[in-house]
Amino acid sequence: LHSALPAIIAGARCPLVDEDPSQAPLPKIAYVMSDGAALPLPYSRSVFGLKQAGWLVGSVATGQSWGGDLEAVSLHNGLLAARHVLGADIIVLTQGPGNLGSDTPWGFSGVACADALNAAAVLAGEPIAALRVSQADARVRHLGISHHSLTAYSRATLCSALIAVPELDGEFGELVKSQA
């Protein structure tokens, strides 16, 4: 989800446990936006704020989306542009604001997460996936690890990817652990 972008970037900026925070270099992070939701990148207040704060080195709009610092025809070109033109150490690729879903197993824009991971792998990157986890969504299919994450990562992704599973307490934590 586009709304996860600031949290993902905040996590990427945190030093590792064994690093001295004062000595840990901050990675150069670029945002690549797919065309699975709103097409104008300027609709994203998150990207604007992250760039203003210096947390993003730039943005790339891909496919039919537009309005990034750079624009690319495909996810693959967008990833390459972020790495080689913007000089990113880390690239976060999500759809833009807004979501499309049909309440069917395959009818949601988030299945495109698999395409992003596959593209990163094809380009010899290190695919890392972010889970959609919630206990606030009343829809059962989104309780714990959302069926969006489960479908995209276990059924549509054709490569290996790192996926961080949060360690949570209580009954909800047990649910997430069992789903992972």
Where are these regions (language model features)?
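Phosphate-binding glycine-rich loops and their immediate beta-loop-alpha structural context
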Residues: 1-72
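Weak global preference for isoleucine
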Residues: 8-9, 29, 90-91, 128, ...
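Short, hinge-like loop/turn segments at secondary-structure boundaries
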Residues: 48, 78, 145-148
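Glycine-rich anion/phosphate-binding loop at the beta-strand->alpha-helix junction
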Residues: 55-142
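C-terminal functional extensions of proteins
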Residues: 136-180
